[in-house]
Amino acid sequence: MAVSMREVDAVFQGAGQKDGLEIWRIEKLQAVPVPKESHGRFFTGDSYVILKTTALKNGSFRHDIHYWLGKDTSQDEAGTAAIKTVELDAALGGRAVQYREVQGNETERFLSYFKPCIIPEEGGIASGFRHTEINEREHVTRLFVCRGKHTVHVKEVPFARSSLNHDDIFILDTKSKIFQFNGSNSSIQERAKALEVVQYLKDSNHEGKCDVGSVEDGKLMADADAGEFWGLFGGFAPLPRKTFSDLNGKDSAFSSKLICLNKGQTVPVDFDVLTRELLDSTKCYLLDCGSEIYVWMGRETPLEERKRAGSAAEELLREVNRPKSHIVRLMEGFETVIFRSKFSKWPKKADAVVSDESRGKVAALLKRQGFNVKGLAKAAPVKEEPQPQIDCTGNLQVWRVNGTEKTFLSFSEQCKFYSGDCYIFQYSYPGEEGEECLIGTWFGKKSVQDEKTTAISVASKMVESLKFQAVMVRLYEGKEPAEFFSIFQNLVIFKGGVSTGYKKFVSENGIEDDTYSENGVALFRVQGSGPENMQAIQVDTAATSLNSSYCYVLHDGDTLFTWIGNLSSSMDQELAERQLDVIKPNLQSRMLKEGSEYDQFWKLLGVKSEYPSQKIAKDQESDPHLFSCTFSKGVLKVREIFNFTQDDLMTEDVFILDCHSCVFVWVGQRVDTKMRAQALSVGEKFLELDILMENSSQETPVYVITEGSEPQFFTRFFTWDSAKSAMHGNSFERRLSIVKDGVKPKLDKPKRRPTTSSSHTGRSSVPEKSQRSRSMSFSPDRVRVRGRSPAFNALAANFENPNARNLSTPPPAIRKPSPKSPSSDPTKPPQRAASIAAISASFERPRPTLIPKSIKASPDVNKPQVEASKPKPEANGKDSTPSKDSPTVTPTIQEDLKEGQPENEEGLPVYPYERLRTSSINPVTDIDVTKRETYLSAAEFRERFGMTKEAFAKLPKWKQNRLKIALQLF
């Protein structure tokens, strides 16, 4: 039900429009804004409304509203705060989650807004207390108790020995010194977090200038700080063993109760199993879980009904005498994960992408019919491709798993994967602190379980041999992150497999082996973001495998087609041309535009049928969530840390950072060996539990990262200081050194990163990364000759300089001198180089075109293409073919070769450019639409393309297509 803004306090208009905090204090039953400089300062006699607005990656805002009640606040102010919270939610569109916060028992989410803590001050508006400024009052010795491993709850207690106990941590703030007393039963992590409160008191109460002392429970007068501390209490005396904590754990035995609110009346709802179907959109409900009460408000309920529901929850707490229980109010459709987890069945949220899918289908349909869909296609929101966060100039080594062994792949084979196999890769690259290393496993969709187990075991041993200073990642085909594709740059994934495990599995189960064959029929989908991030993936040889948003390569023996989808980009088309050099380097491809296919093309695909037009959806990176973990006997328990920072990563613990598209398991240096070995299992168990109820895939990438070896694609989620993860000691010792000395301790940085170990490779070196980059990517200015002989390709590969290095990598510390011939003269170019130049020049002569330009493309492709066009003589009668001694000139877009030579007319009619354009309002009919440029006159061709037709013909096919696309002739 729509809510009128007349029912909402005007002070809330415009709230929640930017990331950050907004706070209002209740003064005379009205909400009054609190200035930003006073945020985090609360008074025990007041009530507040706090709005936390978070900007999400999808461009929207998430709103969390809290109303905080001081222990001395009046009942009227508390009630007003609750009502104003409902009004603020209405002003925000009814999407916020609302929390009731009681002084001393605040939620961890609320406390995370005011790190490291909040310490309410005496005073209040209604009570008449005077708000004294810090610099107006004299220092009074105060004692605080601190509880919490990840978020600190601070409470002031009487300054007396009887307040101390063995379970908690206490901070004594005196005029000249701050003491931290660590109870013997407190953890290292709790002590480290309490030190953040010490730092806060030092900065706020002492202007950062006072001594800090640490006192360990059980240490007597021998310690100077301990002696001084106990002296303030009148001397040392034993503390009682058992103490009662007013922050006891939640009652796990409490049986949940569901109560329906109908016209001001409360009606219990009986149920055997709590399901979503019990909730009606026209009503409000209370779900009493003991330590918290949830108020669920149906979308169709009026504002007054929602206010009454909040009051009913407050009344329920008074009746059952649970004043410290939390109240969480939620609107239908915006329920929290914790609330949904209370139900045995909760429907999954559907992704709202129907409009984009429909738009793509309509655009593809119209384009097939010859309409210009440029505007329609652009109307769809473009999802940015994730950018790789890794240096791509490193050294790569790859192994294929064969049964229980691994087989090293040569440089030419390391980027050719099979879907039935498992692979292990090791990638060393320059990082911010030195060389970094990534060791990963890749599982094909049809790989066998035994080889997956072997891959994980071998990769784990490789990481262990490098003293856990390498990052480990487990990947599945189809779920690879951007970093993986950037490392491999030009990846081809074939069907089937060649490993012993796959072959054995196929044989034993009587399954047809569909392993790729060069002479068979195969269809590849080409994808990627650029020449150094492109993939060709073999798909089923069927029309249903096509997609209007991609380009495809289809071959059957010596027949080769390139299919261009109507919604594909010019970059997609360029990548398809480049992939031909990998899949079929010695064949000439026939380019087919969607809607202009040959009959033979459809015959190879079986039968013509419908196919999709929308790009294949990828898991999008969402806003990260950090969880602390405990894992024992196969049981994983997690606790979310809100508004996290690097300081939340404790060296004694294991944490999970969930970004939806991938999961990072961070392992502290002081984690025990057993837990460290189970890190990958922790990540897999986390995915299995689906903690955030996002329908996470078990094949989501899982990274295992050891403290001190954090890569940039992990640290980008934090404001990162690499020095912190390289500090001495445990969490408490590190923080104490900073608090006491005011500076960071001396660092002991490990040598990052270990060089490639020959024990895993069977060789002592790997190809230089510059060599790797050259062989896996192509310069856009390089003219590549399609169909040149394998002999020339091999010769060119052998003569590439393997010693040329990318400048981003330092040269080896020691370089052995190469042996020189006694007769060599360093001042003269070697004869070998001259010989290579001569041989290369002879190989680079322009090859005759396979299809004569005078013949139009015909659907009948079964006729042998044996006729070749002969070189035309120049005007002076000389043959235009260069001699062996003449250098080969490579034409570029701006060059105009042989300007004085008459144009080679092809016997075709000449039409003006405006009628040949694909978007022409008066298009020419009965022409070969794949060669629109050939119908231009020589003069207009030169005007439009900036070169002659001969120069254009000598360009690589992909460059020709790019020019034609730019001129709307493609």
Curated annotation (Swiss-Prot):
Matching InterPro entries: ADF-H/Gelsolin-like_dom_sf, Gelsolin-like_dom, Gelsolin-like_dom_sf, Villin/Gelsolin, Villin_headpiece, Villin_headpiece_dom_sf
Pfam families in the cross-refs: Gelsolin, VHP
Any one biological process term the GO annotation gives: response to calcium ion
Keyword Cytoplasm: yes
Role, per record: Ca(2+)-regulated actin-binding protein. Binds actin microfilaments (MFs). Involved in actin filament bundling, severing and capping. Caps the barbed end of actin filaments and is able to sever them in a calcium-dependent manner. MF severing is promoted by VLN1.
Family: Belongs to the villin/gelsolin family.
Name of the protein in its database record: Villin-3
UniProt organism field: Oryza sativa subsp. japonica
Lineage, broadest ranks: Eukaryota, Viridiplantae, Streptophyta, Embryophyta, Tracheophyta
